[in-house]
């Protein structure tokens, strides 16, 4: 899927908004891609996940043991990436301000993890979620994101596939 085709998916879902937006990172933007809205259609979410999965090198796709995403925004795209890759998908959540594994989710020692987000701006939530995964024994091999709001400047310490 080309960038234009991805934007067409956002437009079709009325999820490409124009105006003035204050982002959760504190930054301002003239445009806002509402990922929750574009992902509410399961067929569209599946197409976008397949396109995102296709950006990963084949050897990376084959090495992944588990997809992990931070709640809330990453849950749907993380699940769909798991489906696209044929891998299990779980999420970490922040009930008290720091990410943790809950709901009986576990990570096997040394498991190769693909972190998946809906949107990355500063990368802070990704890095915090990665700390939780590493503390549980996982090895983050890459991150994929539906939207890169950093303009290509974010450094997550692992290969990044927006």
Task: Go through each PLM region and give its residues.
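PRPP-associated nucleotide enzymes
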Residues: 1-116, 120-162
């Amino acid at each position: 899927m080309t960038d234009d085709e991805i934007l067409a998916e956002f437009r079709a879902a009325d999820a490409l908004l124009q105006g003035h937006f204050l982002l959760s990172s504190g930054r301002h933007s003239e445009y806002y891609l509402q990922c929750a809205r574009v992902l509410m259609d399961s067929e569209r979410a599946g197409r976008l996940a397949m396109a995102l999965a296709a950006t990963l090198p084949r050897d990376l796709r084959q090495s992944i043991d588990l997809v992990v995403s931070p709640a809330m925004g990453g849950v749907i795209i993380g699940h769909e990436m798991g489906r696209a890759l044929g891998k299990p998908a779980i999420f970490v959540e922040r009930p008290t301000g720091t990410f943790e594994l809950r709901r009986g989710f576990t990570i096997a020692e040394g498991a190769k993890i693909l972190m998946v987000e809906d949107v990355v701006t500063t990368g802070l939530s990704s890095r915090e979620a990665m700390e939780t995964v590493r503390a549980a024994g996982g090895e983050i091999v890459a991150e994929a994101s539906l939207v890169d709001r950093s303009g290509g400047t974010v450094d997550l310490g692992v290969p990044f596939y927006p």
